[in-house]
């Protein structure tokens, strides 16, 4: 029994004594005060009071007058009450004590972070490790052993029994293999052991993960390598060590390795630029990201009745409910109690892991919500987002809910995305995308801004490729998310500055306006220099860019790899030109002006949902428009893309080819699973349900006409006719869909298979859904075989 249970044991005894019928003895007098003293002491001391002291305290209170057996009899008779309630009381005290804890008391308590390293490592080891983290210095074996020992001791103290090299293969989710700390001791017992070698290197099977041809089935050896820049953490009593994953031949088989390479590429080129501006104190440049995560919550008992949600993560059938998101009443609305409880538990779990969960609110669609963290270094933000998605689903299960991360779980309402807030900063704390008070005169900012503009224009196809999945295809361009055409929103102020530079005209800065709301008691504040454009795929938002095309289930690694690499290429070109310039300022102005003229086509400050913009973008401006995943993925191997990515050593050609194949395979497999699920549901659930209802209606008509032969039974016969027609159509369209899947088996090339799915399978899936959804609207509720949209979207109360 823990200290809380002990406390409530004695408090229960005091309460029992207090309940003795009206006896004003010393048992009653002062007992309430004693209870509160015990409780307050427990909270303040965090349950560290000596149990022996509590024993003595209770013994004195209970046995102070041994000549009164009546009181002992009362305790005996009420002992059953104590046994059944004391642990509930203990839990109650523990909950109250937890509420009294501040977040700072437990934030990062499951992370082997800098605070822990400083406390557990000697100064030399700590400094050496930081040299590796900050400057990329080689990790000495002695340092690795010391860190491993400290890490193991800390983890064991926190209840860990195993460790794992935690990595991000090309599946889109994380992977882990657990090994225990135990080693045999000479006396037949065990010792807890963890070496530096085990810390820095692991050997998982590389043939069982997607490799795009880099690994054959018989070529199983792969390696994981510790990423010391991302802190180790404890999850489910397992020490998780963030690692990179690569093959026996050295090819990257994960998403972390290319991400770290892209960050290093951008760092190299940005440092060249900063040196030209005289920033001698800067030692490195890092990109930072804050990903906003959208998701849906549905009741678990309803989720388990839908095969489509279980197999695919989205609904493949479902008629529109009477109410959706038309009233705009869910966005920022009051959070329902059950959801609020989920959010509170989620925050606590994330905070324990050092994840900076900051903002939470209802999103536009019913049952849709959002979680946003404070930004952090890109590779750490990527690790944190993968952890966040995993923990969101685990915490939801504890609350009887299921967290849906699919980009389009429900038709007819908004899907879920993930906004990637991206910026560049120096190790001295300078945000290189911050305009400052006078952006027109801030040449360094303007150069980095132009580098981003040039990068997005030159490699718009790579940005589209980085967010391409079967699920995200449902969102992009559907008037709920940015279009598939990539463009940049800058806002009025920056647009005015660029126009002035392009035309060599003076720039007149607009005066800052104060917001006047017409109510004296409300505060007045300066209006921002630009509005927000929620329809833009890539929007400047004051001191960062918000890349809004990512799907909610996407790893943010892919988008940031391409973005970092593309900007690194722009900075390389600028540095090459400026380093050899005779007149730095003149060359700088000329280069900024040329960038604006050459790449202004990518800038669009209007409504991205407007069809007229899509026509202008493609027909007039010549921007890329790749509506689907098969349209864009093959362009990852375009010559310009291969040249840039290999030149900066972000990918090798073999790695690029493998990723192209893996993305197409994932697309094909995803859609085929969805199509097979539709066939299964149509034949085993929908058709039998409609037939059952039709039979019931037929029986009703027969019964009525037995009693009154003259009855027309127009309602029943009309409905029977409609349902019979729909039954035939569902059966035919199910067969058509199955036939199209069989035809795919004869296609050997993965690109051709993806095209066939895009051109044939998706259309037949949509046709089957249309007739099935119509049948749902005509079938009695008791006959429909699975929960409806209305139940799913409004089931969490």
Give the role of each language-model region.
Residues 2-5, 18, 25-28, 33, ...:
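Targeting/processing segments of secretory and organellar proteins
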Residues 5, 10-16, 34-36, 40-44, ...:
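Short terminal hydrophobic/aromatic SLiMs and anchors at protein ends
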Residues 72, 79-99:
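Short, Lys/Arg-enriched N-terminal segments with co-localized hydrophobic residues
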Residues 106-219:
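Active-site core of metal-dependent hydrolases
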Residues 168, 186, 397, 427, ...:
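Hydrophobic alpha-helix feature that most strongly marks membrane-spanning transmembrane helices
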Residues 220-405, 414-417, 424-661:
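Glycine-rich, acidic/polar active-site loops that bind/position phosphate-bearing ligands
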Residues 592, 599-797:
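C-terminal amphipathic alpha-helical interaction region
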């Amino acid at each position: 029994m823990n200290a809380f249970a002990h406390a409530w044991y004695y408090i229960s005894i005091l309460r029992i004594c207090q309940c003795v019928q009206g006896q004003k003895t010393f048992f009653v007098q002062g007992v309430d005060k004693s209870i509160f003293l015990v409780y307050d002491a427990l909270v303040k001391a965090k349950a560290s009071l000596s149990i022996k002291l509590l024993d003595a305290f209770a013994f004195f209170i209970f046995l102070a007058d041994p000549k009164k057996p009546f009181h002992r009899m009362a305790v005996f008779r009420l002992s059953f009450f104590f046994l059944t309630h004391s642990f509930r009381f203990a839990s109650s005290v523990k909950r109250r004590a937890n509420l009294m804890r501040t977040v700072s008391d437990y934030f990062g308590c499951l992370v082997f972070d800098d605070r822990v390293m400083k406390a557990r490592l000697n100064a030399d080891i700590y400094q050496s490790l930081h040299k590796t983290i900050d400057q990329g210095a080689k990790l000495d074996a002695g340092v690795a052993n010391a860190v491993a020992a400290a890490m193991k001791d800390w983890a064991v103290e926190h209840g860990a029994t195993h460790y794992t090299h935690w990595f991000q293969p090309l599946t889109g989710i994380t992977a882990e293999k657990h090994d225990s700390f135990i080693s045999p001791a000479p006396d037949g017992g065990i010792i807890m052991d963890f070496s530096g070698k085990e810390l820095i290197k692991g050997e998982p099977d590389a043939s069982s993960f997607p490799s795009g041809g880099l690994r054959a089935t018989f070529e199983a050896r792969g390696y994981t390598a510790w990423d010391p820049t991302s802190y180790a953490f404890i999850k489910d009593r397992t020490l998780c060590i963030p690692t990179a994953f690569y093959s026996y031949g050295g090819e990257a088989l994960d998403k972390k390795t290319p991400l770290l390479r892209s960050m290093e590429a951008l760092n190299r080129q940005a440092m060249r630029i900063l040196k030209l501006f005289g920033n001698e104190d800067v030692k490195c440049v890092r990109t930072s990201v804050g990903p906003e995560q959208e998701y849906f919550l549905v009741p678990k008992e309803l989720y388990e009745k839908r095969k489509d949600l279980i197999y695919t993560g989205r609904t493949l059938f479902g008629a529109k409910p009477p109410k959706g998101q038309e009233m705009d009443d869910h966005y920022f609305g009051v959070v329902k109690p059950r959801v609020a409880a989920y959010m509170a538990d989620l925050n606590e779990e994330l905070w324990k892991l050092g994840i900076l969960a900051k903002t939470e609110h209802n999103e536009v669609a019913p049952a849709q919500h959002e979680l946003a963290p404070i930004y952090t270094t890109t590779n750490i933000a990527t690790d944190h987002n993968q952890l966040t998605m995993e923990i969101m689903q685990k915490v939801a299960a504890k609350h009887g809910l299921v967290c849906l991360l699919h980009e389009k779980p429900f038709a007819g309402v908004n899907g879920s995305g993930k906004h990637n807030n991206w910026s560049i900063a120096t190790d001295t704390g300078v945000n290189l995308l911050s305009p400052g008070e006078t952006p027109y005169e801030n040449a360094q900012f303007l150069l980095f801004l132009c580098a981003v503009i040039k990068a997005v224009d030159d490699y718009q196809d790579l940005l589209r490729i980085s967010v391409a999945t079967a699920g995200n295809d449902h969102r992009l361009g559907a008037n709920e998310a940015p279009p598939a055409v990539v463009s940049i929103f800058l806002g009025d102020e920056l647009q005015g500055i660029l126009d002035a530079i392009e035309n060599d005209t003076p720039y007149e800065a607009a005066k800052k306006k104060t917001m006047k709301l017409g109510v004296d008691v409300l505060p007045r504040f300066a209006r921002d220099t630009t509005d927000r454009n929620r329809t833009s795929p890539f929007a400047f938002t004051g001191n960062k860019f918000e890349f809004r095309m990512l799907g909610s289930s996407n790893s943010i690694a892919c988008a940031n790899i391409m973005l970092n690499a593309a900007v690194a290429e722009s900075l390389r070109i600028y540095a090459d030109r400026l380093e050899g310039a005779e007149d730095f300022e003149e060359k700088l102005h000329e280069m900024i002006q040329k960038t604006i003229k050459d790449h202004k086509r990518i800038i669009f400050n209007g409504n991205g949902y407007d069809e007229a913009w899509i026509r202008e973008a493609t027909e007039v401006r010549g921007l890329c428009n790749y509506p689907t995943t098969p349209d864009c993925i093959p362009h990852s191997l375009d010559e310009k893309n291969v040249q840039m990515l290999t030149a900066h050593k972000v990918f090798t050609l073999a790695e690029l080819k493998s990723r192209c194949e893996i993305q197409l395979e994932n697309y094909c497999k995803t859609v085929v699973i969805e199509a097979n699920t539709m066939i299964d549901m149509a034949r085993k659930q929908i058709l039998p349900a409609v037939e059952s209802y039709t039979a019931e209606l037929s029986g009703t008509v027969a019964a009525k006409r037995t009693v009154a032969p003259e009855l027309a039974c127009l309602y029943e016969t009309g409905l029977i006719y409609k349902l019979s027609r729909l039954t035939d159509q569902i059966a035919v369209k199910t067969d058509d869909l199955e036939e199209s899947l069989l035809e795919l088996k004869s296609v050997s090339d993965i690109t051709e298979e993806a095209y066939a799915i895009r051109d044939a399978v998706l259309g037949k899936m949509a046709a089957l859904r249309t007739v099935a959804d119509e049948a749902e609207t005509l079938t009695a509720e008791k006959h429909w075989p699975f929960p409806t949209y209305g139940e799913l979207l409004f089931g969490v109360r």
